[in-house]
Every structure is written in structure tokens, then in C-alpha cells.
Amino acid sequence: FLPIIAGVAAKVFPKIFCAISKKC
């Protein structure tokens, strides 16, 4: 598992979760 992918996922996932759950 590449550290770069982990870094990108760490930045993108919170935004996706925020949009889906509507909890920002």
C-alpha cells in the first residue's frame, strides 16, 4: 500500500464523508 495513496485518501475521504453525512 503506497504512502502517496494513503495521503490522498486521508484528504479526500473526510470531504466525501462530509458530503454524504451532511456533517461538516
Curated annotation (Swiss-Prot):
Localization of this protein = Secreted
Per the record, the coiled-coil ranges are none
UniProt keyword Disulfide bond, yes or no: yes
| Species of origin | Lithobates pipiens (Northern leopard frog)
The name of this protein is: Brevinin-1Pa
Chief subcellular location equals: secreted
Question: Which positions form S-S bridges?
Answer: 18-24
Tissue specificity of this protein = Expressed by the skin glands.
| Alphabetized InterPro entries for the sequence | Antimicrobial_frog_1
- UniProt family annotation: Belongs to the frog skin active peptide (FSAP) family. Brevinin subfamily.
- What biological process terms from GO does the record include? defense response to fungus; defense response to Gram-negative bacterium; defense response to Gram-positive bacterium; killing of cells of another organism; positive regulation of insulin secretion; positive regulation of mast cell degranulation
What lineage, starting at the top, does this entry show?
Eukaryota, Metazoa, Chordata, Craniata, Vertebrata
Q: Which GO terms describe its cellular component?
A: extracellular region
- Pfam families hit by this protein: Antimicrobial_1
Does the keyword Membrane feature in the UniProt annotation? no
Q: Which UniProt keywords apply?
A: Amphibian defense peptide, Antibiotic, Antimicrobial, Disulfide bond, Fungicide, Secreted
The free-text function statement in the UniProt record for this protein reads: Antibacterial activity against Gram-positive bacterium S.aureus and Gram-negative bacterium E.coli. Has activity against C.albicans.
